[in-house]
Amino acid sequence: MSFVPGQENAGSRSSSGNRAGNGILKKTTWADQTERGSNNQNRGRRNQPKQTATTQPNSGSVVPHYSWFSGITQFQKGKEFKFAEGQGVPIANGIPATEQKGYWFRHNRRSFKSPDGQQKQLLPRWYFYYLGTGPYAGAEYGDDVEGVCWVANKQADTRTSADIAERDPSSHEAIPTRFAPGTFLPQGYYVEGSGRSAPASRSGSRSQSRGPNNRARSSSNQRQPASIVKPDMAEEIAALVLAKLGKDAGQPKQVTKQSAKEVRQKILNKPRQKRTPNKQCPVQQCFGKRGPNQNFGGPEMLKLGTSDPQFPILAELAPTAGAFFFGSKLELVKKNSVGVDEPTKDVYELQYSGAVRFDSTLPGFETIMKVLRENLNAYQNQDGGADVVSPKPQRKRGQRQVAQKKNDEVDNVSVAKPKSAVQRNVNRELTPEDRSLLAQILDDGVVPDGLEDDSNV
């Protein structure tokens, strides 16, 4: 018995597939799937033999194995495809964490001719296969294989193969790729949809090459897709994004003090329940200092607000508007107006209480628990109790004058001079030679009072 992605319970390994006349299971390729939707358009033409993994040379344009998930396409050159440790395995119903292990396989796509006649190479697309399946079913986890990126859940044992059934395209469609909350997609890549864009593109291009009459007939006999994806759609998307931004995306937008002030004021002008804290308007400027009634947020999250990299995983726990109103206890309370200029203004509070329940089966459970522990009642572990936004140090009133007065007193003491040269030696013990010398200097020949030798006292 093997697990089947997308099903709640484990199922047996699929073995239906496409069978040849001798009853042998024939491996089906992406090329076969692509040709199915266009065979009904080959009117008056001799059917071409289908190319499979056994009949077509390995030219890099055919994926020889079916992945359970849609691919991840590169749209920026020079970007490395990798995931953080413990991330990168697509999630699907029915697959336990112990079986979430495998690898991403790089599929080098074919080139195409642009409208101006130039030959362009499509950037590669990556497909996920569980460990022990796919083109490198015999490889061990972590082997150095070109075009392979190994990923695994932290709870998975990578020493054994995953007990996952092979995907039969006639029975199971590709599952849209999605990851556990907190997963960071490699920069320069985007997740494909259901995997049906290639046949739509091929059938659309064929109908355009037949002329207006045949194209009209084809459109009447076949339902047109909602949107036709061209081979160079990734490049066009990138160009449109850059044009929308009006500058190179590689140059970060500079935030000046004036722009940050405008953003902060714009946020603070909104009602309290509509504010979204960020770097320009931190949490405590939006909602006040931390304390028993507002007890969430560590130093880093208070500083960054929703811009904190850990915040998206917390947003998975946030209730929807429907859950807020219909799943909470609500109470309408009238409050006294605090406005002096508007004493008759009616102020109400919609007080609410509720709970968000989750268990260890929630994707990203360990990360969520870690973030919650770091931020719940974090103000109690900080110096001075509740963490407040540290204002610029203010000089106490009169502090400058007091300091200046002390400096003046020190200066006065340092520059004060004795009234006479004799007084400088008052505290010095006089020797007989000193007394004799002083007697000669003075007119009367008598040593003044106060200059007597301390030894005679």
UniProtKB/Swiss-Prot annotation:
What does the record give as the organism's lineage? Viruses, Riboviria, Orthornavirae, Pisuviricota, Pisoniviricetes
Ligand binding (RNA): 109, 125, 167
Composition bias of kind Polar residues appears in 49-61, 215-225
Ranges of compositional bias, category Basic residues: 267-277
Q: How does it assemble?
A: Homooligomer. Both monomeric and oligomeric forms interact with RNA. Interacts with protein M. Interacts with NSP3; this interaction serves to tether the genome to the newly translated replicase-transcriptase complex at a very early stage of infection.
- Region annotation (RNA-binding) maps to 56-197
Q: How is it modified after translation?
A: ADP-ribosylated. The ADP-ribosylation is retained in the virion during infection.
Residues bearing Phosphothreonine are 177, 431
Q: Name one GO cellular component term.
A: host cell endoplasmic reticulum-Golgi intermediate compartment
Localization per record: Virion; Host endoplasmic reticulum-Golgi intermediate compartment; Host Golgi apparatus
Note down the stretches annotated as region Dimerization. 267-384
Phosphoserine carried by residues? 170, 194, 390
Enumerate the spans annotated as CoV N CTD domain: 260-383
* Sequence ranges of Low complexity compositional bias: 9-23, 193-212
Domain CoV N NTD spans what residues? 64-193
* Entry's family note: Belongs to the betacoronavirus nucleocapsid protein family.
Q: What is the annotated role of this protein in its UniProt record? A: Packages the positive strand viral genome RNA into a helical ribonucleocapsid (RNP) and plays a fundamental role during virion assembly through its interactions with the viral genome and membrane protein M. Plays an important role in enhancing the efficiency of subgenomic viral RNA transcription as well as viral replication.
List the InterPro entries.
N_prot_C_CoV, N_prot_N_CoV, NCAP_bCoV, Nucleocap_CoV, Nucleocapsid_C, Nucleocapsid_N
Sorted alphabetically, the keyword list is:
ADP-ribosylation, Host Golgi apparatus, Phosphoprotein, Ribonucleoprotein, RNA-binding, Transcription, Transcription regulation, Viral nucleoprotein, Virion
Q: Tell me the segments the record calls region Disordered.
A: 1-62, 158-178, 190-228, 249-290, 382-429
Q: Which GO terms describe its molecular function?
A: RNA binding
Protein name (Swiss-Prot/TrEMBL): Nucleoprotein
